[in-house]
């Protein structure tokens, strides 16, 4: 199944990838993305740990329907969450690229 030194090399690659993933997770926790709704009238900024850092609401919305404003805030947060997930997937792909895995082997993440 594994060629000469294959298992040792695979273990070494797995350890290197684990170190890269740890570093990537630390970096992504610092990344901030901003989601928007209502054509930018509501903006929500979250970090890589999905913690809300900032909410910006255009003053024109303060006079409108409270329920609509709540919906816009939720939509902006969901947009930000999708953006941070996309960022995480991109970084994860770069961490695992180049690792030579046996056919059919799937990573546990």
UniProtKB/Swiss-Prot annotation:
Q: Name one GO cellular component term.
A: cytosol
UniProt-recorded name of the protein: Nucleoid-associated protein NT01EI_1109
**Gene3D superfamilies from the xrefs?**
Nucleoid-associated protein YbaB-like domain (3.30.1310.10)
Native source organism of the sequence: Edwardsiella ictaluri (strain 93-146)
Indicate whether Zinc appears among the record's keywords.
no
Q: What does this protein do?
A: Binds to DNA and alters its conformation. May be involved in regulation of gene expression, nucleoid organization and DNA protection.
Q: What broad taxonomic lineage does this protein's source fall under?
A: Bacteria, Pseudomonadati, Pseudomonadota, Gammaproteobacteria, Enterobacterales
Localisation: Cytoplasm, Nucleoid
Q: How does it assemble?
A: Homodimer.
The UniProt annotation puts the region (Disordered) at 89-109
């Amino acid at each position: 199944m594994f060629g000469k030194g294959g298992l040792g090399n695979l273990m070494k690659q797995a350890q290197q990838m684990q170190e890269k993933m740890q570093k990537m997770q630390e970096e992504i926790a610092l990344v901030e993305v901003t989601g928007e709704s209502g054509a930018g009238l509501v903006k929500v900024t979250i970090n890589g740990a999905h913690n809300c850092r900032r909410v910006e609401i255009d003053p024109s919305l303060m006079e409108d329907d409270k329920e609509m404003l709540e919906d816009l805030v939720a939509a902006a947060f969901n947009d930000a969450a999708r953006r941070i997930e996309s960022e995480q997937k991109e970084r994860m792909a770069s961490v695992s690229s180049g690792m030579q895995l046996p056919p059919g082997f799937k990573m546990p993440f």
